[in-house]
Amino acid sequence: MGKTISIKVLFGIYLLLMAGKVFAFSCNVDGGSSIGAGTTSVYVNLDPVIQPGQNLVVDLSQHISCWNDYGGWYDTDHINLVQGSAFAGSLQSYKGSLYWNNVTYPFPLTTNTNVLDIGDKTPMPLPLKLYITPVGAAGGVVIKAGEVIARIHMYKIATLGSGNPRNFTWNIISNNNVVMPTGGCTVDSRNVTVDLPDFPGSAEIPLGVYCSSEQKLSFYLSGATTDSSRQVFANTAPDATKASGVGVTLMRNGKILATGENVSLGTVNKSKVPLGLSATYGQTGNKVSAGTVQSVIGVTFIYE
């Protein structure tokens, strides 16, 4: 009988030791429950930031933290990101860079990263940021809420014994609809609605542009016009409410702009440069009748 009890006690100790090893390394997302391995969704509010030579997609140090359950650097965990980590969804065809543990790597990853050591019980935010490389002038790609924008693979192994290796995959998912800037320059709004006061009033157009590095930019207007000078944009309001004899003109520094006319903005950098545009009515006939005036006008930016 004593022998049987002794065997059960030893067996119980063995199980406890194994359980302790299984939970020696953990992570969480946004302070949630502990994650020991496998695939986890990381929901992020995307707020792209233009930076010199690159556009910040997301700072994941604000979301993912990991720690060593033993603490005291007794059995240190060694963490690295794994080749094959890449953008996904609407960003799948783009290239960028990944910041990890004081080193920046081309992204998608074609090699494993350096190793981050974690040996403390205090959750450590992972030093991890994603950037997209600008590919031209002002441009962007629409990302929808719920879309996976990147998959990052992570490997962990400890110092003692077999190291209890683990694999993690972080699926980075957008919480919001956003236009991700993919160009060296971008505008502060891609769809601007301007309400004009009653005829013959005017209104400022709140539109500006900024760039990740210094660029000489110009822009031009496009859209259907009604006059030979290409300065009065057509009234596209529904016929039932449409005003007659009037369209819309855009002005800059007191000068009416024509479609296709290049307007230089000079050198643009990270500080927003307002386009300085205002909208007003443009008369197209001798007589103006009351009604709705509506025009759709495009603004295209080009490198000088």
From Swiss-Prot:
Its main location: other. Keywords: Fimbrium, Signal. One of its GO terms (cellular component) is pilus. It is found in: Fimbrium. SUPFAM superfamilies: Bacterial adhesins. Residues 1-26 form the signal peptide. GO terms for biological process: cell adhesion involved in single-species biofilm formation. Pfam families: FimH_man-bind. InterPro entries: Adhesion_dom_fimbrial_sf, Adhesion_dom_sf, Bact_Fimbrial_Adh_Pro, FimH_man-bd. Belongs to the fimbrial protein family. This is Uncharacterized fimbrial-like protein YdeQ. It comes from Escherichia coli (strain K12).
